[in-house]
């Protein structure tokens, strides 16, 4: 999970509490020294949030459109399950391939920069001097001093240069990590995507099917409730306030659900069979 230091620091920021902010930094500074500050992998967190939100909204939209078009419950369930797994597999594979491509590009650029630092150190230093002067407005002497200090640690200089010059963050990702991201995306999409479908199945199968409007409302309420909770969870890792983040997710879900439902109703009433 996100570090306690970060949670306390954000709480202090939201409340404009300087004392709490200092306490959070001072207390957890000692924990950091002993390696006790555990941070959640930001890339995996991004994958989980994106996959879960995309899953629940995508399947919600599909079910809503089917219900609006007054498709039979059996057909809705078949269409929903088919789309759930098809989209989950597609999203997982896309995450794997994009992560692999990003990793390969990053490693290729890293090797190139390593070669240039080894064979053209003066030119590489001058590039960083120019960046410090042009981007950060350091004077010539300070820029050169910074470069000479950072160049003593070749790994730091390499990673810092890749970040400043190429906009790339050096990671230690291997192909197993890329595969892991793909699996996380698949599971996130599938687990949360099944929520609106499960609500529909529960209403139509276990409680008896009555009418299309009520079934839509059941799916609508269950989906928006889940999105609200996801929004609160997401706010723990962003700079948004919990309620603001949650309401934004609910608004997104409302639009994504209402549009296909209304389109289904209109098309059903205007297209002859």
Curated annotation (Swiss-Prot):
Pfam annotation, one family: VIT1
Keyword Transmembrane: yes
InterPro entries: Ccc1_fam
Membrane spanning residue stretches: 48-68, 76-96, 182-202, 213-233, 247-267
Listed result of changing residue 113 to A: No effect on iron tolerance in a yeast heterologous expression system
Taxonomic lineage: Eukaryota, Sar, Alveolata, Apicomplexa, Aconoidasida
Binding residues for Fe cation 1: 113, 116, 124, 127, 165
UniProt effect for mutating residue 161 to A/L/C/E: Reduces iron tolerance in a yeast heterologous expression system
Record's protein name: Vacuolar iron transporter
Keyword Coiled coil found: no
